[in-house]
């Protein structure tokens, strides 16, 4: 069955492609030469570590990792415990407060509990130089993450894709709308949230879709690992 496949099963061949090896080599060379790259090497593929292929129910696409100290840890929009919640995530919390009964904004921005429930928090570019947004945008990461999206499209059924902003929405072309559910809105960034991210109701609509399919809805209240034990 498709849900028994692992990321390793479907990505092993892609990870041997010359472009991918070149991407890894470029990032490794920059780190070795003293350039600060986020996230740390051990965290680059955390989205796949925390959400197994067979568990993917929702995909939230980000662009590239946060480029400030200690922020990025491999999950789109998420920051480590103890790091100030970034503006886009604050706006996501605001939308959750306005639409999910009982949701109260947490005092952290760590979204591992979403990932553990089947929310793939995938940046389309997986590394960035410190302080330089989009500095690794042309390294080949997008070829890899486009492949990831196409593999989810192929091997999973009934996944909700939350595509926020024009960059993410372009990825909609890869997704079969007959097999999956696509929700589009402006990006939650302060620059665009007021143009329709607020009021998009995506978190509610995603759960309604999952429940209609007989699946467990996502608990959107982010909890720190110690709290959930």
Swiss-Prot record:
It comes from Escherichia coli O81 (strain ED1a). Its EC number is 3.2.2.27. Belongs to the uracil-DNA glycosylase (UDG) superfamily. UNG family. It is an enzyme of class 3 (hydrolase). It catalyses: Hydrolyzes single-stranded DNA or mismatched double-stranded DNA and polynucleotides, releasing free uracil. The active site is at 64 (proton acceptor). GO terms for molecular function: uracil DNA N-glycosylase activity. Excises uracil residues from the DNA which can arise as a result of misincorporation of dUMP residues by DNA polymerase or due to deamination of cytosine. GO terms for cellular component: cytoplasm. This is Uracil-DNA glycosylase. The lineage of its organism: Bacteria, Pseudomonadati, Pseudomonadota, Gammaproteobacteria, Enterobacterales.
